[in-house]
Curated annotation (Swiss-Prot):
This is Con-Ins F2. It is found in: Secreted. Heterodimer of A and B chains; disulfide-linked. The modification 4-carboxyglutamate is found at E115. SUPFAM superfamilies: Insulin-like. InterPro entries: Insulin-like, Insulin-like_sf, Insulin-rel_pep, Insulin_CS, Insulin_family. Disulfide bonds join C29-C104, C41-C107, C53-C120, C106-C111. The keyword Glycosyltransferase does not apply. This venom insulin facilitates prey capture by rapidly inducing hypoglycemic shock. Intraperitoneal injection of this peptide into zebrafish lowers blood glucose with the same potency than human insulin. In vivo, when applied to water, this peptide reduces overall locomotor activity of zebrafish larvae, observed as a significant decrease in the percentage of time spent swimming and movement frequency. Residues 59-89 form a propeptide.
Amino acid sequence: MTTSSYFLLVALGLLLYVCRSSFGSEHTCESDASPHPQGVCGSPLAEAVEAACELEESLQGGTGKKRGRASLLRKRRAFLSMLKARAKRNEASPLQRSGRGIVCECCKNHCNIEELTEYCPPVTEGSG
């Protein structure tokens, strides 16, 4: 094997390693996969997202406006109510059918707080 071929092989191996390690945290699911033993499903999943979102907002200092904050909390609660309703519908949820999403990441697999906060609705200053 020549030096350039060896270098190319090592470079490709390193690239594969980097790609696999950076994308390895994404979970994929089959629709018939069973829940993870430490997974959180249904209403407890929606409550976990709500708690994670509230924690993230408090760590970021909130919006700083009482009036805007109340409006944001109402919007967030409406979003989380919708999330709970989807969790109750279970298999009818488009999040499950896609093979990736909150049910795949946190019910059929085990997720962490960072993955939960990815599902928080966006907080904007201008609403109110």
